[in-house]
């Protein structure tokens, strides 16, 4: 009911250098990474798709729990891979992280009520918002102000990206591979284990009861009826209208975890041109590890 997820990731290599010395391979990598994670309750979409007729009465609210975690940061890593023998290789990649921007929205208790007699829609609102960026946010006082700053990301220069005085984090990747014979091998690894500490944050903690939200939600209903659905606009409208686009304030430092991934892989190679691979992974999303299994064939 509360555990629906949308996840997107983007990575751009800016610089990569490497060399080999005997059984040791060393590489330096500088990349820019973006990841976003949205999680929402079943009622969040069901309310718009099925209407509010299923949520009549104060004892039958629509659960509007929703959250987001979006981060943009650069990563400098030094990779070391060592071949112990013909069968076993190990590797480690420590990383320094420099955060550009983060937005975290946590809401676990917002409820939408529909009066069974008047059909007036009200909300009990509970939201926690925190955000940080290397941009100047002295003039940011609301959600709208903060959102507009993200359109200025293309003005960031390299001096700001490499500013190691704020939004610093550390991470590590490590793993090993073992080849049993010419046909069969396995590998295991842990990727993106680490955190970023964000400074100069903006925060908002909003708890309100009986907020009238008819206008905000009816506009979104009309968009759905016209098949004019923009999830970004829908999400923004809810934040501004349901959770209120009022003041946000200066906050303290906070940490966010990287999206850690644990991987176990095995392959069977019939010929150099024919391989079957199985990959089992655990992704860390919304404070839980989520399993995934991939089967691949190449030939």
Cite the ranges covered by each PLM segment.
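Subset of outer-membrane beta-barrel
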Residues: 1-299
């Amino acid at each position: 009911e509360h555990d629906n997820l949308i996840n997107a990731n983007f990575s751009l290599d800016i610089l990569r250098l490497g060399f080999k010395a005997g059984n040791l391979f060393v590489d330096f990598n500088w990349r820019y990474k973006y990841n976003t994670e949205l999680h929402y309750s079943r009622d969040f979409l069901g309310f718009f798709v099925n209407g509010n007729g299923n949520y009549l009465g104060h004892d039958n609210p629509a659960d509007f729990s929703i959250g987001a975690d979006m981060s943009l940061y650069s990563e400098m890593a030094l990779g070391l891979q060592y071949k112990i023998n013909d069968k076993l290789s190990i590797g480690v990649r420590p990383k320094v992280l420099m955060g550009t921007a983060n937005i975290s929205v946590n809401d676990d208790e917002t409820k939408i009520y529909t009066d069974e007699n008047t059909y007036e829609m009200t909300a009990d609102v509970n939201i926690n918002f925190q955000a940080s960026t290397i941009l100047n946010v002295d003039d940011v006082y609301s959600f709208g102000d903060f959102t507009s700053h993200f359109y200025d990301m293309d003005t960031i220069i390299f001096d700001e990206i490499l500013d190691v005085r704020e939004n610093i984090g550390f991470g590590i990747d490590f793993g090993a591979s073992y080849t049993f014979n010419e046909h069969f091998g396995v590998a295991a690894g842990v990727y993106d284990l680490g955190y970023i500490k964000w400074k100069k944050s903006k925060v908002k903690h909003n708890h309100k009861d009986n907020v009238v939200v008819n206008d905000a939600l009816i506009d979104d209903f009309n968009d759905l009826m016209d098949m004019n659905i923009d999830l970004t606009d829908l999400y923004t409208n809810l934040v501004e209208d349901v959770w209120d686009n009022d003041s946000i304030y200066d906050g303290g430092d906070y940490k966010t975890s990287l999206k850690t991934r644990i991987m176990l892989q095995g392959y069977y190679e019939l010929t150099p041109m024919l391989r079957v691979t199985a990959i089992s992974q655990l992704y860390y999303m919304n404070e839980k590890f989520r399993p995934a299994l991939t089967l691949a064939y190449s030939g």
